[in-house]
């Protein structure tokens, strides 16, 4: 998931781990360099920005508490190439499934006006649904808004508060 830090010239990455029961297991936030037409302007104005996407995912996966006696589990993600290497490194004995969202979109377009559209299975629905809920509940994540994150740590803290509320923790 991506967001911004004060301006589109300073994008952020948000690594999210979600269980099949929609429980948020962990979150990490990192910086990204600007992409496309904004990259030159971003370089001039703010200097080079590190791509912390892979580090955020690795830190998130390492922070997950997995019992040594736990049975095997399946790690599901989208098809970003760096995920395979990181998952294999952190969880060498676990199976990693990658899913291409583009295939699912094409199926939906083809079956738009038929009854079959409702039967299309999205294997990473839990993750996509939690990301949509995050964007809806945390206004600093909405795409076209003045409510932007000014500091990376504040965004991470806000997402942790959402995680606690989502998972049913009692806040004191």
Task: Give the positions of each predicted feature.
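Residue-level recognition of single "structural anchor" positions
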Residues: 1-172
